[in-house]
């Protein structure tokens, strides 16, 4: 597939690397704490024009990231974190995240009023717009999978079918080239004509590349493409993450694990309330612009999923800028960072669901001078 599309897969290992402590302390601004409150000034929906204007006004130009394509997550901890968020009572407010489909699972767990997904790569924005279109057109989970991978829908799948049974029904079904062409045309039609979004030539090419990749690799698509994805995806596939990522009780948890979860995410997309943004976590604009927008409307951040982005921020000397940016977001005592790699390292919820305000205060006091220290959630 890589030869067919003329793309070069980067053979970078993706083992977690803990950057050494390069600085003795980080100068971080004090977090903006707000009282727990109803966020009734947040919009119940955004018009197409307002949604697209918001994407444009908040976004920074697309930037470089070491992983050129990031089609899926590779974090199998998502099922555990889903249930941990539910048990902790992290609920409502505004969600922020990074990366592809795993955000929908955290959104399904938290049930926020709206969400912002920030990624340095502009292609990530186009991938989320692809997801948006499919969510809006697909009535249920089986139709979502059918459209995403251009596979005819098997019979006898309904709202009561378990996600693993849905995947078992799809495995023997071959992808269909006619459906692929038709689905892609419908996606473009919905985004550009129905919604009125305008894309550059590069953005249109990115949208097609992403959809072609899901068609070409099928449900075994992983971070960089196929299983293992050229040395960086650790073999975890889209099907694994949505159907076989279990919580501590052995139950699969994802945005596709129940019809209710799917319907919630679909509803936010249908009201233009999942906003994809191109921006650098350590950059000058995106996160701060989101913070200003939320402050104006009384919004409160409930959770910020950061994956392992902090690892790269410490390597690039941008961690202090990131924490400074986060300090401009409206948070309260319940607001948390979601850090899967803390769960992998420590196995406790207090590290992996790290309270944001106390952490930022600890960072100001020099207690988070490295990625390794940040993962421990000093407070």
Where are these regions (language model features)?
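N-terminal secretory signal peptides that target proteins for export/translocation
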Residues: 1-11
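Conserved SAM-binding loop of SAM-dependent methyltransferases across substrates and taxa
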Residues: 102-110
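Class I S-adenosyl-L-methionine-dependent methyltransferase module
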Residues: 113-275, 368-379
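Boundary at the C-terminal end of the N-terminal hydrophobic targeting segment
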Residues: 34-38
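Mature N-terminal segment immediately following signal peptide/propeptide cleavage
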Residues: 42-87, 94
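Conserved class I S-adenosyl-L-methionine
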Residues: 90-101
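Alpha-helical subdomain
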Residues: 215-379
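Bacterial N-terminal signal peptides
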Residues: 13-29
């Amino acid at each position: 597939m890589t030869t067919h599309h003329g793309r070069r897969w980067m053979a970078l290992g993706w083992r977690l690397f803990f950057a050494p402590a390069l600085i003795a302390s980080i100068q971080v601004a004090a977090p903006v704490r707000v009282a727990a409150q109803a966020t009734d000034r947040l919009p119940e929906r955004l018009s197409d024009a307002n949604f697209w204007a918001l994407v444009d006004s908040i976004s920074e130009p697309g930037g470089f990231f070491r992983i050129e394509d990031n089609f899926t997550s590779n974090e199998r901890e998502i099922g555990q974190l889903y249930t941990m968020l539910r048990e902790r009572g992290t609920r409502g407010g505004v969600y922020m995240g990074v990366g592809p489909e795993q955000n929908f699972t955290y959104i399904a767990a938290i049930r926020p009023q709206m969400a912002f997904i920030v990624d340095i790569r502009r292609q990530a924005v186009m991938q989320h717009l692809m997801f948006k279109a499919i969510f809006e057109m697909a009535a249920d989970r089986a139709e979502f999978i059918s459209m995403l991978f251009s596979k005819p829908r098997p019979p006898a799948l309904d709202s009561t079918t378990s996600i693993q049974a849905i995947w078992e029904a799809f495995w023997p079904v071959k992808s269909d080239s006619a459906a692929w062409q038709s689905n892609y045309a419908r996606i473009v039609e919905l985004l550009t004509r129905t919604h009125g979004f305008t894309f550059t030539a590069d953005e249109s090419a990115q949208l097609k590349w992403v959809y072609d990749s899901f068609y070409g690799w099928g449900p075994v698509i992983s971070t960089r493409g196929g299983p293992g994805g050229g040395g960086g995806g650790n073999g975890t596939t889209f099907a694994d993450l949505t159907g076989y990522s279990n919580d501590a009780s052995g139950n699969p948890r994802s945005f596709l694990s129940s019809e209710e979860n799917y319907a919630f995410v679909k509803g936010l997309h249908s009201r233009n309330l999942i906003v994809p943004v191109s921006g650098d976590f350590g950059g000058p604009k995106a996160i701060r612009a989101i913070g200003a927008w939320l402050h104006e409307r009384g919004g409160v951040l409930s959770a910020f999923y950061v994956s392992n982005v902090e690892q790269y921020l410490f390597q690039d000397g941008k961690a202090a800028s990131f924490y400074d940016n986060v300090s401009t977001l409206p948070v309260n005592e319940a607001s948390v960072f979601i850090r899967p790699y803390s769960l992998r390292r420590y196995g406790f919820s207090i590290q992996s669901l790290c309270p944001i305000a106390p952490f930022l205060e600890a960072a100001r006091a020099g207690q988070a001078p490295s990625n390794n220290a940040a993962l421990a959630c000093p407070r």
